[in-house]
C-alpha cells in the first residue's frame, strides 16, 4: 500500500475515536509543519565522450544557486526522492530534470536501473505492470516540473504521460534544443533541422547541403557552412552535430530453405518494406528507408537484418525577435518556447 494512503487511514481512525481531540491538536495532525523549497535540480545522466551537456547544465544551475542532486538517473529514483522528501514534510515549487532526449529514441533517462528508455510505450507499460514508483499527489500537486530535454516539447503524448506519472500541477519542456555552456549565452534554445544518410556512405557536405536547401527552401541558413561547423563559433550562426540510429530484427525459420535470399541492399529494402513489423518501425521513425545502410546475415535458421542511419542535426540559435544582438531569453513561462501542460 502506498505510504500516503497509510497516513490518511491512520488519521481517520484516530479522529474517529470516542474521545475528541482538542481543536489545536486536531489542527496539528491535519496541518503538519510543511517546508516549501523553491526548487531542486536532478542531473539525470552523465557525460560521455566529448559531450559535456550534463556538466554544463550543472554549472549553470549552480550559478543560479539552485540545489542539485546527481546520481539519480532513473524516474523511479527521482520519484523515490520526492516521496522521501514529502514524508519529511518538504515540498518543491519547481523540479528541474536534466536528461538527454531525441525525437526518435525518447529520453535517455531510464524507468529503472538497466531498464528501458523513457518513451510513451515504455511508460504506459510500466504503469500497467506496476513497474514504476507511485508518487503521492499531495507532494507534487502544486509543483511545476520542467524537463530540460532536447525536443521533448514536440512529443506532447510523452509529456502528458510524464505529467500523469508525476501527478504534477504543471509540466513543461521545449520543442527546441537546450544548449548549456554556450559561447555567447550560458543557456539558450536552438531550432533543429534534420537530414539523413546511410551510415558511412555520406556523399559529402556539398551534396548534403543541397538536400537541406531542398527540404527547407524557406530557411535562410548557409547549410554548407553549418554542416562543416561542429560547434558554436560565431554569434547566432548555425552549426551541426550527428548521431546514429540503428534498427535490427531477427527472424527464425523452421526450414532454412524458406529463408529469402537477400543478395543486395535493394533486395533487403524490398523485403523490409513488405514486412508489416519492420515497416511499422520505420514509419514511426519517419526516416526514409533508403537513408539506412542495410546489411543481412544468417545464423543457422535465423535471418538477421540490420539497418543504420546517420542523423545530421543543424542547430540554429533562437535570437531576440526585436532585432537585438542577443539570444532569446529562456523563460519557461513563454509558450512560444515551451510546451506547457
Model-found features: residue ranges?
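Low-complexity, serine/threonine/proline/glycine-rich extracellular segments that form mucin-like
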Residues: 88-92
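Sec-dependent N-terminal signal peptides
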Residues: 4-13
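A domain-level signal for caspase-like cysteine endopeptidase catalytic cores
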Residues: 23-81, 87
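A general structural signal for stabilizing positions within well-ordered secondary structure
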Residues: 85-86, 136
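Catalytic cores of nucleophile-dependent amide-cleaving enzymes
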Residues: 93-183
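Active-site-proximal C-terminal subdomain of hydrolase catalytic domains
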Residues: 144-326, 332-339
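Sec/Tat signal peptide C-region and signal peptidase I cleavage site
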Residues: 18-22
Amino acid at each position: 500500500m502506498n505510504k500516503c494512503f497509510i497516513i490518511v487511514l491512520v488519521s481517520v481512525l484516530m479522529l474517529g475515536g470516542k474521545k475528541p481531540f482538542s481543536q489545536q491538536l486536531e489542527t496539528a495532525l491535519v496541518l503538519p509543519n510543511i517546508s516549501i523549497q523553491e526548487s531542486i535540480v536532478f542531473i539525470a545522466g552523465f557525460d560521455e565522450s566529448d559531450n559535456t551537456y550534463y556538466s554544463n547544465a550543472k554549472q549553470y544551475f549552480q550559478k543560479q544557486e539552485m540545489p542539485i542532486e546527481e546520481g539519480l538517473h532513473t524516474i523511479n529514483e527521482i520519484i523515490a526522492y520526492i516521496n522521501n522528501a514529502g514524508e519529511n514534510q518538504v515540498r518543491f515549487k519547481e523540479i528541474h530534470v536534466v536528461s538527454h532526449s531525441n525525437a526518435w529514441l525518447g529520453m535517455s533517462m531510464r524507468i529503472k536501473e538497466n531498464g528501458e528508455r523513457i518513451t510513451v510505450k515504455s511508460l504506459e507499460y510500466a504503469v500497467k505492470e506496476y513497474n514504476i514508483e507511485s508518487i503521492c499527489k499531495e507532494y507534487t500537486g502544486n509543483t511545476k516540473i520542467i524537463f530540460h530535454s532536447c525536443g521533448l516539447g514536440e512529443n506532447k503524448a510523452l509529456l502528458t504521460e510524464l505529467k500523469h506519472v508525476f501527478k504534477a500541477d504543471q509540466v513543461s519542456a521545449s520543442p527546441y534544443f537546450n544548449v548549456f555552456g554556450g559561447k555567447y549565452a550560458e543557456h539558450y534554445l536552438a531550432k533543429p533541422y534534420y537530414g539523413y544518410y546511410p551510415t558511412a556512405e555520406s556523399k559529402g557536405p556539398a551534396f548534403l547541403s543541397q538536400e537541406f536547401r531542398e527540404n527547407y527552401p524557406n530557411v535562410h541558413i548557409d547549410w554548407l557552412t553549418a554542416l562543416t561547423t561542429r560547434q558554436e563559433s560565431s554569434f547566432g550562426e548555425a552549426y551541426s552535430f550527428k548521431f546514429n540510429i540503428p534498427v535490427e530484427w531477427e527472424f527464425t525459420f523452421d526450414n532454412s530453405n524458406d529463408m529469402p535470399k537477400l543478395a543486395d541492399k535493394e533486395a533487403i529494402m524490398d523485403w523490409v518494406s513488405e514486412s508489416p513489423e519492420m515497416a511499422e518501425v520505420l514509419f514511426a521513425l519517419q526516416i526514409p528507408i533508403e537513408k539506412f545502410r542495410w546489411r543481412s546475415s544468417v545464423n543457422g535458421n535465423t535471418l538477421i537484418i540490420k539497418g543504420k542511419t546517420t542523423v545530421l542535426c543543424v542547430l540554429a540559435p533562437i535570437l531576440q525577435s526585436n532585432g537585438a544582438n542577443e539570444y532569446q531569453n529562456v523563460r519557461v513561462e513563454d509558450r512560444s518556447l515551451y510546451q506547457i501542460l
